[in-house]
């Protein structure tokens, strides 16, 4: 039986290969490790990991702004979008994502997110022949006039539970004046909210809202905030692993 040890020794390399033990220390492999988190520049991967929870799958139907709305994409320029992503929005749940502000995204990754949103959701002709109202809320505004405009242009949809939710001090403490204005101007087609023209809103006057009208409506909604309501802290950015 002297041949038996020799046969086992000869068969040992084959057994290793068949058993999956071929990847021993120092062995070459066609399988590469995944990239480090700060090296990921793929837009779908970055969006799904960092944005989807608040802004929804595919940029819509989330609790935060509908990023897939072409009107929103047309109204906000790259610099403002970059500043919001990088530094967050104080008083809201939008956190700062830039590493320079305590977040976990590099400048290159933020640029990749912006470029990806533009490629996927922007439509350069969305406002062809139309001049939309200013996107940012100015100081001031006539809250009393805004209340009248709200009744004429908004109340037919925002009634009952919907109205209570919109004018809830808790909700209003979570959303900035600029965010309220952006929703009125750009609309939220994912949830049926029309834009400032509200030409698809049932029962609403068909005359578009002016920039001053929107300023006054936002001033009215802002007046309903409870000063004692604590503003929401930004959602914490998960630590880098």
Put a short name on every predicted segment.
Residues 1-10:
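Bacterial N-terminal signal peptides that target proteins for export
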